[in-house]
Every structure is written in structure tokens, then in C-alpha cells.
Amino acid sequence: MRIVEVTENKKQYLNLLLLADEQEDMVDRYLYKGKMYVLDDDGVKCECVVTDEGNGILEIKNIATVPPFQRKGYAQALIEFLVEKYRGQFSILQVGTGDSPLTIPFYEKCGFVRSHIVPNFFTDHYDHPIYECGVHLVDMVYLQRPL
């Protein structure tokens, strides 16, 4: 298993990016300003995009695993890679997600704790309703983990 930075042709991973953020123009807002990493384990299994949000905060903007390989530890391995790589350069690793029974427990298992909420984020910024595990996502829930 190896994790590599993608510096060119990031859109080749669009189908994977859209698993985590299903509207392409929203992905475009951070894809090229962020750093992208892919986890390769006999083929790409997982990707993430992180951005420098200032004030010592590194934010995971997108993280997704190829569906047949979900729940096998790939996303968690990618998060641990980020923690090790950016420790000392940033003080906080942050992620924003919907209030979903799928994502919140995953991030909490990875050591994140709830930080704050941006009300109506999904209803204000997406051109269609977003559902995950049958839950209509409205607010963006931010979680943080110290680096």
C-alpha cells in the first residue's frame, strides 16, 4: 500500500470525488487549490483532497473510497497519513460533513470531535437535496482533531 500526491490531471478521479461530494461545481471550488492524495493498494482504493484554511487549520474537503473496498481501513489509513505528514505544519485537522449516521461515527472513530455547525450549508449551496442513509442533509457539521 502506498499513498502518493496527485499534482496533475486530478479530474481523472472525478468519479471517486463525486462519491463524497456529488456536485461537480462544488468539487471544482477546492480541487485545484488543494493537495490531492490517492491510496494505491493494487489499484487506487481511496482519495482525499486537503486545503489550508489558515490559522493552523488543514481541512479534508473530500475523502472517498471505491465502494467495494469501503470499511476495509483505507480512509482511516489516509487520515493517519495526513496526521503524520502535516503534524508540525498545522495544529488542527478539520473535516466538514453532513449530519449522517454513516460519516459522523467514522470521523469520531478516527479521533475527531464535533467543533461547530454551518446551518443550511447543503440547502444553500447544492442545486438538489442531498441524502445519505435516508437522512436529508441540511447543516454542515465540522469535526476537528489536533495534529
Label each region the model flagged.
Residues 94-96, 108, 113-136:
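Conserved catalytic-core motifs of GNAT/GCN5-like acyltransferases
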Residues 34-36, 137-142:
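Short hydrophobic/aromatic beta-strand or adjacent loop that forms the aromatic wall/cage
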Residues 69, 73-81:
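Conserved acetyl-CoA pyrophosphate-binding loop and the N-cap/start of the following alpha-helix
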Residues 85-99:
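Conserved GNAT acetyl-CoA-binding A-motif
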Residues 1-9, 141, 147:
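Conserved N-terminal entry element of GNAT/NAT acetyltransferase domains
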Residues 4-67, 79:
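Acetyl-CoA-dependent GNAT
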Residues 64, 99-101:
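Active-site-proximal loop/turn and secondary-structure-junction residues that shape catalytic pockets
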